[in-house]
From Swiss-Prot:
Encoding gene, per UniProt annotation: prsA2
Lipidation (N-palmitoyl cysteine): C23
Annotated keywords: Cell membrane, Isomerase, Lipoprotein, Membrane, Palmitate, Rotamase, Signal
Compartment(s) where it occurs, according to its Swiss-Prot or TrEMBL record: Cell membrane
Reactions mediated catalytically: [protein]-peptidylproline (omega=180) = [protein]-peptidylproline (omega=0)
Organism: Streptococcus pyogenes serotype M1
Organism domain of life: Bacteria
Keyword Signal listed: yes
Entry membrane topology: Lipid-anchor
Similarity section: Belongs to the PrsA family.
Protein name per UniProt: Foldase protein PrsA 2
């Protein structure tokens, strides 16, 4: 479950070392375990675990969660979280609970992950939209841009099915569109798509392949990896129509801006920049030396993150 545990750079599940969030002080003597001649207190447990990598990641996640809840709580609804949760659950089907457990998550802790991810995504998107985009950025985006194209796309879960379909469309006089409708294993049986190179609802591998094809040309088998489920799918593409690219990038300025903003959402450095800004606004101070370096990746160059006395 790569996507579930890879929310944003440096942020991990809130399910880990949950006790840390309850430790208000290293002097807390609440007993957790008793035995003959000894007890283990919250303080004992805290001091034993706080220097571990797991504890460092848990504290980082807790800090970022608290900061973004304070600054953006009303920007993400419970309905959005539930919708995202259901989408992932549907993708995994009956194995969802097992995959959650293997990732060290419960339904509730995974929903917390989703919420944190969406809070950060909102902040990143707002920052990206407000950034000044230079002419150089627009020209670079324009150079990589392929305008609207229409393509027949077959999708398969099994590579052998894709190979059989490829042989069928290679036959003399083969009708690609008819074969696509007959053989695709896409759930909705859809085969005709119109999109540009900034499309995000189709697999990135498919969009890249289609962008590189000339009108009337067909691809070989394209393998795509679903980042949400880590499953491979196989595709065969035939581009049936391609719009002529206009010479002036300004003709696509609005669309290019959308593509540039979307690119920033996937940029770890930009994400860290936004997180750093939120942490700075919250005036976060690390009080325990054990956690002195947890915010290092968000510090400005040559800026250290010492523990506060």
């Amino acid at each position: 479950m790569k996507q579930m545990n890879k929310l944003i750079t440096g942020v991990v599940t809130l399910a880990t070392v949950v006790t840390l969030s309850a430790c208000q002080s290293s002097h807390n003597n609440t007993k957790l375990v008793s035995m003959k001649g000894d007890t283990i207190t919250v303080s004992d447990f805290y001091n034993e675990t706080k220097n571990t990598e797991l504890a460092q990641k848990a504290m980082l996640s807790l800090v970022i969660s608290r900061v973004f809840e304070t600054q953006y709580a009303n920007k993400v609804s419970d309905k959005e979280v539930e919708k995202a949760y259901k989408q992932t659950a549907d993708q995994y089907g009956t194995s969802f609970k097992t995959v959650l457990a293997q990732s060290g998550l419960t339904p509730e802790t995974y929903k917390k992950q989703i919420r944190l991810t969406k809070l950060v995504e909102y902040a990143v998107k707002e920052q990206a939209k407000n950034e000044t985009i230079s002419k150089k950025d627009y020209r670079q985006a324009y150079d990589a841009y392929t305008p609207t194209m229409t393509a027949e796309i077959m999708q398969f879960e099994k590579e052998e099915d894709a190979k059989a379909a490829l042989e069928a469309v290679k036959a003399e006089g083969a009708d690609f569109a008819a074969i696509a409708k007959e053989k695709t294993t896409a759930a909705d049986k859809k085969t005709t798509y119109t999109f540009d190179s900034g499309e995000t609802t189709l697999p990135a591998e498919v969009v890249r392949a289609a962008s590189g094809l000339k009108e009337g040309n067909r691809s070989e088998i394209i393998t795509a990896l679903d980042p949400a489920t880590s499953k491979r799918t196989y595709h065969i593409i035939k581009v049936t129509k391609k719009a002529t690219k206009k010479a002036d990038w300004k003709a696509y300025q609005k669309r290019l801006k959308d593509i540039i903003v979307t690119g920033k959402l996937k940029d770890p450095d930009f994400q860290n920049k936004v997180i750093a800004k939120a942490l700075d606004k919250a005036n976060v101070k690390i009080k325990d030396k054990a956690f002195a370096n947890i915010l290092a990746q968000f510090a400005k160059p040559n800026q250290k993150q010492p523990a506060q006395k």
